[in-house]
A protein has these predicted regions:
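A cross-domain feature marking catalytic cores of carbohydrate-active enzymes
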Residues: 60, 108-110, 130-134, 155, ...
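Conserved Radical SAM active-site core
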Residues: 22-24, 28-150, 159-161
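Conserved radical SAM core fold
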Residues: 113, 135-137, 155-173, 202-204, ...
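Hydrophobic faces of well-ordered beta-strands that scaffold small-molecule active sites
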Residues: 56, 104, 128-130, 151-153, ...
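Alpha-helical scaffolding segments of alpha/beta enzyme cores, especially the outer helices
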Residues: 91, 95, 114-118, 122, ...
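Non-cysteine beta-strand/loop elements that form the S-adenosyl-L-methionine
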Residues: 145-160, 232-240
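Conserved non-cysteine loop/helix-boundary elements of the Radical SAM core domain that shape
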Residues: 75-88, 107-114, 118, 162-186, ...
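Auxiliary Fe-S-binding modules of radical SAM enzymes
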Residues: 1-22, 189-305
């Protein structure tokens, strides 16, 4: 990609000349080859993703957002990970499947779309989940039409001010909702198999931020007004933990209160959003943040013991 426009930032940089510094290699600071920080079974996604055996998660380093509270800060901002070939990426998929993964869960994949497309040149025997921050180009979503069965986008913001302040993306809502609607056009209504695993469809996630209930209510209204019951799944998350640079923003440098979550949940129920998930209070714990230690990235014969 010598003129990158894979995401809404449309940096138009030459990704072949990437240097891991913002301003020199596009917003995501990524080259052509994927940088992977962890590849392992993950048991803490929504039940229709993790199931009983775990999702086959592949965590990519870098990001096209700069969320100040990112729980994956070590890899999204600090770029911890190992650059691998497209062929090695495909091998990782099959290693995870051999371990029992219900699916292949690509976490923060947007900036490596072209490498991922190549790695999925032939279909996999399990669904592929595109687990993204929501700040997507509809053209990139369309490009992946025949490769992705399950879309797992965040819908972080309905308001411009928090989108700009916390993620440097004032146009987030417009871009994310357009992308989500394109995802739905491609998959149609969600389908869950007899094993409880999502086979195709869209699962929209929203993480409630402390002190930002109006932002959350805007997201909930959008979902209720745009999709009918049975069309998409929705996950109302309370797992916020102050992380990354959250300490620089006093208003979000705390956990969510029980009252805040209950108000958001009640509003969701009032709007008639019934397909999906809520979270227990104990989900707000750093223990659920994976160790980004390179597990599963190197070829088995090259792993260090």
């Amino acid at each position: 990609m010598s003129f990158c426009n894979v995401c809404p930032r449309s940096c138009k940089v030459d990704r072949k000349q990437s240097i891991h510094e913002k301003g020199r290699a596009g917003y995501c600071r990524s080259g052509m080859l994927p940088i992977v920080s962890r590849a392992a079974l993950h048991h803490w996604e929504e039940p229709c993703i993790s199931g009983t055996r775990g999702a086959g998660t592949v965590f990519f380093a870098g990001c096209n957002l700069s969320c100040v509270y990112c729980q994956n800060y070590e890899i999204s901002e600090l770029m911890q990970g190992e650059e691998i070939s497209v062929e090695r990426l495909r091998q990782i998929y099959f290693e995870l499947i051999a371990q029992g993964a219900h699916n292949i869960d690509l976490v923060t994949p947007t900036h490596f779309t072209h490498a991922i497309f190549q790695s999925l040149r032939e279909p996999l025997p399990v669904p592929v989940v595109y687990n993204c921050g929501g700040y997507e180009s509809i053209h990139t979503v369309a490009f992946l039409r025949k490769k992705i069965q399950c879309w797992l986008p965040d819908l972080k913001y309905s308001l411009r001010e928090p989108a700009a302040r916390y993620s440097d993306a004032p146009d987030y809502f417009e871009k994310a909702t357009a992308a989500i609607e394109q995802m739905y056009r491609q998959t149609g209504p969600y389908e869950i198999g007899s094993d409880g695993i999502l086979k195709k469809g869209v699962l929209i996630r929203h993480l409630i931020l402390p002190g930002n209930l109006e932002n959350t209510k805007g997201v909930l209204r959008y979902v209720a007004e745009t999709f009918a019951p049975g069309q998409v799944l929705f996950s109302l998350m309370r797992q916020y933990v102050p992380w990354g640079r959250a300490s620089e923003f006093p208003e979000i440098n705390r956990r969510l209160t029980e009252e805040e979550y209950n108000e958001a949940k009640a509003y969701m129920e009032e709007l008639g959003i019934v397909d999906g998930y809520t979270q227990a209070a104990d989900s707000s714990d750093a223990v659920y943040i994976p160790a980004f230690n390179g597990a599963g990235v190197r070829e088995p014969s090259k792993e260090e013991f």
